[in-house]
Amino acid sequence: MAAVGSPGSLESAPRIMRLVAECSRSGARAGELRLPHGTVATPVFMPVGTQATMKGITTEQLDSLGCRICLGNTYHLGLRPGPELIRKAQGLHGFMNWPHNLLTDSGGFQMVSLFSLSEVTEEGVHFRSPYDGEETLLSPERSVEIQNALGSDIIMQLDHVVSSTVTGPLVEEAMHRSVRWLDRCIAAHKHPDKQNLFAIIQGGLNADLRTTCLKEMTKRDVPGFAIGGLSGGESKAQFWKMVALSTSMLPKDKPRYLMGVGYATDLVVCVALGCDMFDCVYPTRTARFGSALVPTGNLQLKKKQYAKDFSPINPECPCPTCQTHSRAFLHALLHSDNTTALHHLTVHNIAYQLQLLSAVRSSILEQRFPDFVRNFMRTMYGDHSLCPAWAVEALASVGIMLT
C-alpha cells in the first residue's frame, strides 16, 4: 500500500523552537523550546523514566540537577497504572509530582523490544501484555488518546518501528505505514494547543526510503520532528550518514529529536550534525552495573583499583555524589548488598549528561564549538589518532577537522 498522499489536517502548528545561535562552521544549533511547563534550552539530553519514574533517582533530585524535560512511556503507562487513573491525578505531571516538561513516546518502540509479544497490522500494534498476557490493540488513535490523557508537553506519533538491522520490503512497508499513521495521529489529536505532536522519520538505513519519508512528513505542519529507526545495532558509519541526511532535509525552524542516543561521543557528533534533542536509558542503566561516566569515558568502580581511592568520581563535577562521596566508598557499597551505590551513580551519570549538553550549548553560544569538540575528543580518546573513524568522518563532513 502506498503512503497517503494528502497531509493531515493539523493546521498552524505552534512554533515552539527559537534558534538562539548557530555554529558558523558545523550544523550545531543552540535554541529554546517554549513549552507549557517552561522553557528548555537546547541541545538537551532527556532522561528516560519508563513508568513515571527513573530508576535510582527521585523527581526532586532530577529537578535539582537542572533537568527541565524527561520521558515517559505510553505503552507501559497505558497498561499500568492506566490513563484514567493518571487523568484523575491531573495528568502525568501531577501523578509523578513533576513541575517541568514531559515527553511521552508513542509505544512504537515496543514493536522491537517486545517483538515476541506483538503483531503489526494497518490497524495498529496488537500486543500481549507482559504483565498479565491480555491482548490489546495500540492504534494510532489509541496512542494519541493515552498521551492526551497523560497531558505530556510533547507527544509522539505512533510509528511502525523495525530494527535498524532489518532490510528488504518490510522497511519500505513500515516507512509508508508510518506516514499514514502520522495522519491518523494528527486527526485524533485533541489538544494541539497544549500538547505538541512530533512526527517520526523512518526508512531504516535506506537513503531513498528515508528521503521519501522526509519529503512526505515535512508536508505536515507538526511542531517538531524525530529521527527514528536508528541506534539499534547498525554500524556507526551507517548511523551518522542517516542522521546527516535527515537533518539536511528537516525544517530549520523546528526541533530535531534524535531518538535513543546517549553515548557522549554520539551526542557531541550528532549536535554537530544538527540535532537538538536526545534521550537514552544508558546513563541510568550503566549506573546499575557500577559504571560512572567521566570525561575520559567511564570508571568501573567495582574494580579493586578503586578500593583505596578517596577522590570523587570527578573532582570537577558539582553533583551531590561527587561533592559527598569517594570512589572507595562507592566501591565498598557496590560490593555489599546495599543498593545505595546505584542511586549515587545514577545521580552522577544523569548530571554528567546534562552538564555535557550544557557545555556544548555554551560553546555554540560563544562560537567556539569546533574547539570544544576537539578538546572533548582529545580528553575522551587521549589522541585524535585514536578517535573512532566514523566520528572523524562525520565531523569532517561538517567542517570540523580533528587533525
Swiss-Prot record:
Binding site for queuine: 105-109, 159, 202, 229
Main location: cytoplasm
Disruption phenotype: Mice are viable and fertile but display cognitive defects, characterized by learning and memory deficits. Female mice are more severely affected than males. In the hippocampus, stalling of ribosomes on queuosine(34)-decoded codons is observed, as well as a global imbalance in translation elongation speed between codons that engage in weak and strong interactions with their cognate anticodons.
Tissues in which the UniProt entry reports expression: Expressed in brain, heart, kidney, liver, ling, skeletal muscle, spleen and testis.
Domain of life the protein comes from: Eukaryota
Protein's membrane topology: Peripheral membrane protein
PTM-bearing positions, type N-acetylalanine: 2
The protein's enzyme class: transferase
Region annotated RNA binding, chain positions: 260-266, 284-288
Residues recorded with modification Phosphoserine: 139
Catalytic activity: guanosine(34) in tRNA + queuine = queuosine(34) in tRNA + guanine
Active site residues of this protein: 105, 279
GO CC annotation terms, alphabetical: cytoplasm; cytoplasmic side of mitochondrial outer membrane; nucleus; protein-containing complex; tRNA-guanine transglycosylase complex
Entry's EC annotation: 2.4.2.64
UniProt KW keywords: Acetylation, Cytoplasm, Glycosyltransferase, Membrane, Metal-binding, Mitochondrion, Mitochondrion outer membrane, Nucleus, Phosphoprotein, Transferase, tRNA processing, Zinc
Swiss-Prot/TrEMBL cofactor(s): Zn(2+)
GO terms assigned for molecular function: metal ion binding; protein heterodimerization activity; protein homodimerization activity; tRNA-guanosine(34) queuine transglycosylase activity
Family: Belongs to the queuine tRNA-ribosyltransferase family.
Subunit structure: Heterodimer of a catalytic subunit QTRT1 and an accessory subunit QTRT2.
PANTHER family: QUEUINE TRNA-RIBOSYLTRANSFERASE CATALYTIC SUBUNIT 1 (PTHR43530:SF1)
Full protein name: Queuine tRNA-ribosyltransferase catalytic subunit 1
Gene: Qtrt1
